[in-house]
From Swiss-Prot:
It comes from Mycobacterium tuberculosis (strain ATCC 25618 / H37Rv). CDD domains: AAK_G5K_ProB, PUA_G5K. One of its GO terms (molecular function) is RNA binding. Pfam families: AA_kinase, PUA. Was identified as a high-confidence drug target. Pathway: Amino-acid biosynthesis; L-proline biosynthesis; L-glutamate 5-semialdehyde from L-glutamate: step 1/2. Catalyzes the transfer of a phosphate group to glutamate to form L-glutamate 5-phosphate. Belongs to the glutamate 5-kinase family. InterPro entries: AceGlu_kinase-like_sf (IPR036393), Asp/Glu/Uridylate_kinase (IPR001048), G5K_ProB (IPR041739), Glu/AcGlu_kinase (IPR001057), Glu_5kinase (IPR011529), Glu_5kinase/COase_Synthase (IPR005715), Glutamate_5-kinase_CS (IPR019797), PUA (IPR002478). Substrate binds at residues 58, 145, 157. Signal peptide: none annotated. Keywords: Amino-acid biosynthesis, ATP-binding, Cytoplasm, Kinase, Nucleotide-binding, Proline biosynthesis, Transferase. This is Glutamate 5-kinase. Gene3D superfamilies: Acetylglutamate kinase-like (3.40.1160.10), PUA domain (2.30.130.10).
Amino acid sequence: MRSPHRDAIRTARGLVVKVGTTALTTPSGMFDAGRLAGLAEAVERRMKAGSDVVIVSSGAIAAGIEPLGLSRRPKDLATKQAAASVGQVALVNSWSAAFARYGRTVGQVLLTAHDISMRVQHTNAQRTLDRLRALHAVAIVNENDTVATNEIRFGDNDRLSALVAHLVGADALVLLSDIDGLYDCDPRKTADATFIPEVSGPADLDGVVAGRSSHLGTGGMASKVAAALLAADAGVPVLLAPAADAATALADASVGTVFAARPARLSARRFWVRYAAEATGALTLDAGAVRAVVRQRRSLLAAGITAVSGRFCGGDVVELRAPDAAMVARGVVAYDASELATMVGRSTSELPGELRRPVVHADDLVAVSAKQAKQV
């Protein structure tokens, strides 16, 4: 299969490769260092061809099962985190040993959703990853499951890999798992499931039924599709391919499903506002303000706000909601929640001089469609 979108992945200089738990485990769920070594070989070939590669690797919990004497993947949070703390050591050591065969050094980068959402930590993570690549080390990124809580069900690093792809300015994202690509329904349950080789936008997914989780990891097809759409919307093409065909996927992108990138890449700040930042509050708007913000791309003024919720400070990201509570945009708010509560519904001329700035400036505001809202 050839297409301009596959060619973009085949020729990408900067690449993020996400390796799912099922790509690193046996059918019984035990960590398999041999499978990891095979994936490292495929990545090495791509790097020898001139690409810079960052790896987002799942598998820490699976790698901790055997050393802790467990018979299966744990279900409770405390044991998952204990397994992750032990397994992360085994996981990064396995990557280190695999790349040592090629004379390469690896660096471990553990992140949480909170790290990505906070602007300072976000920037520090970006600098660390950029510096590792400049020093020709292979960055191995994983979610820090040991301290994560709800994020431990983040989607088996699918969403994290999409965020990292934009963070490092990657030219493409490759998601490797135990699946051939995208089908209109689960091919393991439906014999006549139709394979979808290319997705040009969310409209191509109408009628597609995606499973929510795998039995070994936490990321099912729904998680992978959401991550692929997120990255593609940010301007990064995505290939969803089977880990068994990793060599082919990384060599010429002729397998799996490709998700086409939007023509114009989102700026780092607008991407952070739309997808990465954690919203600490919400502003409910009247219908006129919704039109001004979404259709006319104008700044939000206090007069168009009908309600304020949450605790936030000036500089935080908040959700902007329509009268029916649907999120229509996200933006950087200029005032603390306590200040804003006194401004609701008031025209600019009624406010004191120090409170006449827009509540959310147009430059710090990103409209969000209904489908994008599900990816946030």
